[in-house]
Amino acid sequence: MDNSYKIKVQHVTKEYDLYKSQAEKLRSFFSLSNSKVPHFWSLMGISLEVKAGETLGLIGVNGSGKSTLSNIISGIIPQTTGTVEVRGDTSIIAIGAGLRGNLTGLENIRLKALMQGLTNPEIDALMDDIVSFADIGDFLYQPVKSYSSGMKSRLGFSIAVHVNPDILIIDEALSVGDDTFYQKCVDKISEFKDEGKTIVFVSHSLKQIEILCDRVAWIHYGTLKEIGATETVVKHYREFTKWFKGQSKKEKKHFQRQMKANQKAFDIDAYQQQVIEERQANDPNDQNVAAEVKKDFYGSVISEKMSWGNRFLTIAVGIVFVLACLINVSGHSLGDVLQNPGNIVHPETVLHDTNATSGVK
Ligand SMILES: Nc1ncnc2c1ncn2[C@@H]1O[C@H](COP(=O)(O)OP(=O)(O)OP(=O)(O)O)[C@@H](O)[C@H]1O
């Protein structure tokens, strides 16, 4: 087994249905076709590896798919196709993930640490360090929903680095703090690096990327544009942003519209076919390529969309439930309703024997 990587992402895509409203989502559930709902492919086939002990930076313009990818790696959201392999006895902590708004900072520390597998005595031993690193004062006793984004980031970062994960996913956590906190975080990340931990670091700050990352992946409107040495990829990305800034307002808009249009028009079947052809070209003797690629695409994915069978079953159960309620309310027996379905909307009339109730003979 190849032990050189800690994270391996293969053919990962992410599709979103762009419903205009909840009502449209509901309508599409009951309709036989959802082809009218526009789709958007946030990721269009990403394959990359993060080696054990390396810090991989993710860069790219706004909306390019960095957070989508880091959330998929963290297991926060599922991919639409592809495999995500996280190697070994590994725990991942994503800074922004898992803070519950209704719980206080203190409660969140305990919850996140418990979820990370720590025992209560272990958490008690760490509590002072986590609290002192986060440095958010009395806000610790307030619900997290009252925190500023900087405070959330401080708390999330502090918990993440103290529960000792093998892999740390840091998504834009350093962009919201002040300089002192930023330096504390950089020192902590450097400590992690020295301990040989694996880090995925998402940032718009090329300076931070240059300081912290061994390699960089440039995500560009849902595709992996380039991956390699930090210096090289950052240089190319700087050239791109310089070129983009040099465009007129109209040209910029046109470029962005074109990129988004590509993401809407992405054809997953064509992409799958392309992967099959590439593999066949590499290994012409392999007769099972199509089945292998299908397994790689869909084998480890739980579909977020309901199959027609399940949809039919859900609707049928719903109808049976409503009928059962109506029969119950109508007072008729099931046999009566089956013989005369109209009874269901005509409640049974109960005739009272007035003589019996009044006791008159
Ligand atoms: N739940 C969702 N429904 C529909 N589209 C979504 C959803 N989440 C993300 N997207 C879209 O996916 C694309 C990628 O978003 P993502 O947040 O991953 O980008 P990013 O590179 O992290 O951006 P930024 O640098 O601004 O944080 C964007 O176009 C975004 O609008």
Swiss-Prot record:
Record-level Gene Ontology MF annotations: ABC-type teichoic acid transporter activity; ATP binding; ATP hydrolysis activity
Localization (cell): Cell membrane
GO annotations of cellular component type: plasma membrane
EC number(s) stated in the UniProt entry for this protein: 7.5.2.4
Binding annotation for ATP: G60, V61, N62, G63, S64, G65, K66, S67
Primary residence: membrane
Matching PROSITE patterns: ABC_TRANSPORTER_1, ABC_TRANSPORTER_2, TAGH
Record InterPro entries: AAA+_ATPase, ABC_transporter-like_ATP-bd, ABC_transporter-like_CS, ABC_transpr_TagH-like, Bact_Polysacc_Export_ATP-bd, P-loop_NTPase
Gene3D superfamilies for the chain: P-loop containing nucleotide triphosphate hydrolases
Record's catalysed reaction(s): ATP + H2O + teichoic acidSide 1 = ADP + phosphate + teichoic acidSide 2
Region (Unknown): 247-361
Topology versus the membrane: Peripheral membrane protein
Keywords: ATP-binding, Cell membrane, Membrane, Nucleotide-binding, Translocase, Transport
Domain ABC transporter: 13-246
Family in the record: Belongs to the ABC transporter superfamily. Teichoic acids exporter (TC 3.A.1.104.1) family.
Functional note: Part of the ABC transporter complex TagGH involved in teichoic acids export. Responsible for energy coupling to the transport system.
Protein name: Teichoic acids export ATP-binding protein TagH
